[in-house]
């Protein structure tokens, strides 16, 4: 149960906690009041964002997905997400608090479904990829204990810590350190020069707020085991949320044999986090430990000028060739009330710090690169009013030359991409992608990155582009390697400085010889099994099978991927790029005739039956990761615009003869549609169930022609993240994605919404984003949460018992669950660990004592409409036969069927699942093909 920290009086007065005991009219008034307050939070949020965007102008685009997710997960009471609760939950999971006590027949059957073989609990999911895509990476380190110089550690922003034992080989696989790390946001990694077996990993990404951190993790055995240090229990103090959420950098200095650990802590980024209680504001600053991280002391000299008790938000820490400590800063969440950004400090003794540069731009983010041969020489890259600036010093910061000097002696790189401004090679994203590093052997050679990578051989006086993110916008004629956009890290191999690694939004890239970049293969991807891809969603092709698979998945900055074919030796599927940029939601026809895929906002496309690709809608309205649905029966596409209005396109089975229009579910009251689900039980028209971000459920009938909408009364307030159906249109499962002590995130109705049952049970306080009910055993339900897959075997109980069924996937955000009944395949899309499936290979897929499948036979299969079932009539008198289509809807039923008795169907071509029942007992299930 969620821990209630309020007093009993407060609980009694709480609308969410108390409304269920009110009279229907009083409850309705309470819910309306609660929704009104939530809409006010949304309005406040929108106003805050407009202010932030105005401050940045068009120079720095907002991180739209994180803004969207912030709204969808906020506590309705406080107006802010409560990520820090996941830290306590992780501790509970580690202690085994939510370990399953029984297997679910819904999931992969490894040792049988009778509950006696507990292995089914431990490995229900199979990793499917992508195998060579990667994802956003800010932390890379060559293992100092590997004399070959081949072993590398790297951290995904939301995919945990990984190791590759031979980075020089394109076939060498990355291995996750542990599923424990899977929801850990890695921002930095370093080792102790006095004891190279000791590593420190900083967590949390303040640049986007995409993933909250959990302090610092330490290992003393080269990465085999880890302990958590420098963690402050999160708590509120007024509007300030305290905690070490963002450890941007960790470095270790050898001071005459004493290991001094420096940790750079930042508050949340103002350009992304908003209305969030000033997350980590008071903990920002530079910290130092001399006892292995047992204790840390804040260095008070690095404080904002407005408040000596408020530390600067630290961006980077570097140890110079003379053992001096350099520190750069970044913007503070407190904005003008804390002039944090644009500063560089230096200390020769690790105690007394001198400010050696101040851009007097409080919002500036500063990255540094120090010479390994000249302790007084450094290069700096920062966001500024230009909007980016490069600086250089050769005297320890006493004087600087800069690209904004009246007569500059150093210059900015200019990208060959005509879509990137000549004065901003970060393309307005200096808050996000920014890195500069000199060569460790020759410090006149400098590397820098924004969107693409550049090299200077004359101390930043001039630059040459050495990578390109695409062949668009004039880039095709540039001889350079194709390297993913958005650069975050540049690292040299200490054993061979000609070898380099680059970290970006596409993962890890490797250069074997940095003396020659005049080649399309000078820099190559090293993402083999580096599966840290962040998927917004994924959809199975309903007519495929695990041995001839196809599904589409849309990823953050890695486009839409197509998984296809049979499993490889490692169980991954072959993956190809289906569409670039940010891939969003996808859909399939129930007969596999067309595919729907998406870019951001209302940019939706279709692969038609003739194999050609067409645009369904191409407008920049709607959500960044926009909501869509397809009625596979009526072949109609729907997507949200704003409020309760939607796009509609009919005729999806045609080749570009689509009829497009706009429909509405009524007048919104400051809220919007957050989920569209198509009822599989209405077959002659479209019936939609629409969820809103205030907790409303709207039923829209005749959505494909002349819509009529009815609001279904609900007892919940929050963002409706998923709507699924049980055995009929009256059985509706709903999830909400908000944090909140009094939030209930799972609901069920079996009477079409006349009454609702709270199915929260013992579920911890965390967002729930997806849900699915076992069609053959409704007591089993799984959900996709912020901490992996959870499930229950007693959903029908008043208070279900939930457990984590997420081994392999780990504690990773699950954004969508899809299901293919014909093969009993589940697909889980994760935000940080790629795509996973679970297929129950036991055709019974239920716990029973009936005969095995050898006692049954369906023929002919495939069929053209007539089916026969053969079985031993001595064991079973007459059977009741049902057929279900790919959506799980029952489409055929016949009772009292004898062995070898003909059953004539008029079903369309496709895959179906046949279920044979002896009374109330399911005795046989099998896929059937009608053609």
Segments and roles (model prediction):
Residues 1-26, 846, 851-853:
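Bacterial Sec-dependent N-terminal signal peptides
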Residues 2, 826-829, 919-923:
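Short glycine/proline-enriched turn or capping motifs at secondary-structure junctions
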Residues 15-18, 24, 218, 288, ...:
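Generic detector of low-complexity/intrinsically disordered segments
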Residues 23-842:
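Beta-propeller blade termini and top-face loops
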Residues 569, 575-576, 844-852, 894:
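Short, solvent-exposed secondary-structure boundary motifs
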Residues 849-859, 863-931:
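C-terminal outer-membrane/trafficking sorting elements
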